[in-house]
C-alpha cells in the first residue's frame, strides 16, 4: 500500500483539498512557494495549518467570505438548544498568530490557471493573488429547488449560521400535534448522517418538551437510509417510533415556502409547522470552474485530492 508521507505531501505543496488543486512546478528561483487556499472550513483551514507546520517557508494565504467559520458539525445541538452559537463559531486568529497563515476576507471570483492568479472580491475592491499552488475547499452549493422555495421561511440550516438560528426558533415554537418535516437530499450530499441525526434530535426535543402528538416526517429522496442504516432504522422504528415517520423514495417535486407545503413522489404535505427543506447539492462556487461531473461534483485523486477535471 502506498504511504503518503510528509515528503509526498510537500511535493504536492497544496494539492490536498476538499475538492481540487491546480499544481504547478515551482521554479528554482522561487525560494518561498505561495499557496492560496480558498475556503476556511475544516478542509481548507486544516490544509493551511499543516502546510505552515510542515512546509518550512511556504507562504499560505487563506481566503474566505466570512470573518470566522461557523461549524456545521454540532450545529444540530444549537437547533435543539443544547449548545449556543458561540460554541460552534471558530475564528481564524490561531491560524494567523500561531501558524503564520495570512487571511483575506473576500469571495473568490475567478481562477486564471495559465497565469496562476486568483481574483478575490473584497470590501475594498477586487484583489489579485498570485500563487504557485491553489487549493479549493469551497464547501457546497445548492441545486435549484423546484417550486417556490424561500430559505428565509423554510430553512435548510445546512450551512450553519443565521439559518441555524431560524430553524431553532421555529422548532421552539412547535406545540402539541404539530408536524416537523425534514427532507434528505439525493446522494451525494454533504454529511450523509446529518438529516437522520437532526430528525432524531428533534424527536427527542419534542418528547422532552412534552409536545404530545407532535411528530417528525423524514422525506428521503433516496431508496434507503444513506448512513448507519442499522442504527437509524432502529432509531426510527424503536427508539422514536411514536414520533418519527420515515418515507423513502420521496423525490421532491415542488416546494411552497409560503404555505410550508411540499410535494414528493411518495407523499404530499401541506401546512407543516416546520418545513426543513434541504436541497440537492453540488460543488461550491468557484470549484465549478474546474469542471464538474454529472453529479455536480469535482473528481479528485484519492491519493492527493488533486483535481482530475
Segments and roles (model prediction):
Residues 138-209:
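Glycine-rich dinucleotide-binding loop and its adjacent helix/turn
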Residues 12, 137-138, 278-279:
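Short, well-ordered coil/turn residues at beta-beta hairpins
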Residues 43, 139-142, 281-282:
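Short glycine-rich anion-binding loops that position phosphate/pyrophosphate groups of nucleotides
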Residues 1-20:
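N-terminal secretory signal peptides and thylakoid transit peptides that target proteins
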Residues 18-31:
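A short, basic/flexible loop-to-alpha-helix module at the beginning of a structural domain
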Residues 149-176, 270-309:
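FAD-site-proximal beta/loop scaffold in flavoenzymes
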Residues 98, 102-111, 115-118, 122, ...:
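A Rossmann-like FAD-binding core segment of flavoenzymes
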